[in-house]
Amino acid sequence: GTTCYCGSTLGIYWFAVSSCPSGRGYTGHCGYFLGLCC
C-alpha cells in the first residue's frame, strides 16, 4: 500500500474501504482521498 500521514503518524493508505482491515493492529484512521489512511 501507499504510505500516508494521519496527523504526525505514518500510516498505510487503503483505497475505497469504509474501515481499516481488521487484525493488523490499527489504532485509528483518517479520511484520505477516496479511502482511509490507517
UniProtKB/Swiss-Prot annotation:
Keywords attached to this entry: Disulfide bond, Ion channel impairing toxin, Nematocyst, Neurotoxin, Secreted, Toxin, Voltage-gated sodium channel impairing toxin
Coiled coil: none
Localisation: Secreted; Nematocyst
Major localization class: secreted
Keyword Disulfide bond: yes
Cystine pairs: C4-C37, C6-C30, C20-C38
Transmembrane is among the record's keywords: no
Other facts: Despite this toxin having similarity to members of a potassium channel toxin family, the effect seen on crab leg nerve was similar to that of sodium channel toxins.
Biological function: Possible modulator of crustacean voltage-gated sodium channels (Nav).
UniProt family annotation: Belongs to the sea anemone type 3 (BDS) potassium channel toxin family.
Protein name: Toxin Bcg III 31.16
Organism of derivation: Bunodosoma cangicum (Sea anemone)
